[in-house]
Design a protein with these regions (language model features):
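Sequence/fold signature of self-assembling virion shell proteins
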Residues: 2-33, 149-170, 192-314
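Extracytoplasmic
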Residues: 47, 89, 182, 223, ...
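Short acidic, glycine/tyrosine-flanked loop/strand segments centered on an H-E-D-like triad
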Residues: 77-104, 264
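Hydrophobic alpha-helical segments involved in membrane association or supramolecular assembly
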Residues: 52, 114, 118, 187, ...
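N-terminal "assembly arms/tails" that initiate or stabilize quaternary assembly
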Residues: 1-85, 311
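Alpha-helical scaffold segments that mediate packing/assembly in large oligomeric complexes
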Residues: 99-175, 313
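Aromatic- and glycine-enriched pocket-lining scaffold segments that form the walls
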Residues: 175-194, 198-200
Length: 314
């Protein structure tokens, strides 16, 4: 007896583009740490390593920069430090039964792509956060030494922010710029930390900015030339007595990531009912997946990425 094989096609190209774009947009809504990184694309057929570049600053020398009339000075040499990082793939999927797809009030496949995009966005942002946590530039609240010595009273204060700014300035950290605003550093902290800061009279809420400047997603306010952005995925470690929180204050190009809108793109993978052949003989299952082709993060300059370790008030 002959066996009849029925071939079914996957998503139409227009639908594939739609789900890819939708998943990417939902992933981006979860980005906080990844938003301020130097972005790099991965060259195809170039192995699993991505190369980030950190240009080394020129040393100011007034005597060496004096020009002599009619004499062309010697050119300066560009110098850079290369930081290599190995990429990994990330992904997840859900199964959708034919009965659920038929009886549900909403478009299950569309909703699943949103949920998976949000999940992968959180995963990638936490990967960036965990890399930032490894910075060697650490400031402990109240002058304490080590996580184990942080007490409940060692909360984030305005003075700690001022100390962080002083350190970054001494390290010649490059500032961020944006339309209509002054150059600034960025601080990422959790809601409990901003709660402790916002009671200070020096805090400038975003609604009270004196100039019409472009603002970041999730921006809360400014303090001493630092723009504050909140994340609910902040790194927290318990030292046996209290939870020790990370608050990051940093300049531009302090760390880098893969640009997921480029070669490290997040992709929606939809296998519709009837696409599995003999593995699903009654066409009962469809799957919706999210896959990130390649992603990694790396610290490019620890001196420009400072982590304040502190407790938070109850």
């Amino acid at each position: 007896m002959a066996t009849m094989v029925t071939t079914t096609t996957g998503l139409a190209p227009t639908m594939q583009t739609y789900y890819d774009r939708k998943m990417l947009e939902w992933a981006k809504t979860q980005f906080v740490y990844a938003n301020y990184a130097q972005k790099r694309s991965i060259p195809k057929n170039n192995g699993k390593t991505v190369q980030f570049r950190r240009w080394n600053l020129f040393t100011p020398n007034a005597a060496a920069q004096i020009l002599t009339e009619g004499v062309t000075p010697d050119a300066q040499n560009l110098s850079m430090t290369e930081i290599n990082a190995t990429v990994s793939q990330y992904g997840a999927y859900v199964e959708v039964s034919d009965l659920l797809d038929m009886t549900a009030m909403d478009n299950v496949i569309s909703d699943s792509s949103e949920l998976l995009g949000e999940q992968m966005g959180n995963v990638l942002d936490m990967i960036v956060r965990d890399v930032m946590h490894t910075t060697t530039n650490i400031q402990y609240a109240n002058g304490k030494v080590g996580d184990n010595n942080i007490a409940a009273s060692d909360v984030l204060t305005v003075d700690e922010i001022r100390k962080a700014v002083r350190t970054l300035k001494k390290n010649k950290a490059r500032k961020f710029t944006r339309k209509g605003g002054k150059p600034h550093f960025v601080c990422i902290c959790d809601p409990s930390a901003t709660y402790d800061l916002q009671s200070d009279s020096l805090w400038q809420d975003v609604s009270k900015y004196s100039t019409a400047e472009q603002i970041y997603d999730g921006e809360l306010g400014k303090l001493f030339g630092v723009v504050f952005v909140e994340s609910t995925n902040e790194k927290v470690v318990n030292n046996g007595t209290v939870d020790v929180h990370d608050t990051f204050v940093f300049g531009a190009d302090a760390y880098g990531t893969i640009d997921i809108a480029g070669s490290g793109a997040i992709k929606a993978i939809v296998k519709p009912h009837g696409s599995s052949g003999t593995a699903d003989p009654l066409d009962q299952r469809a799957t919706v997946g999210a896959k990130v082709a390649a992603f990694t993060a790396a610290i490019l300059n620890s001196e420009w990425l400072l982590c304040i370790r502190h407790a938070v008030s109850a």
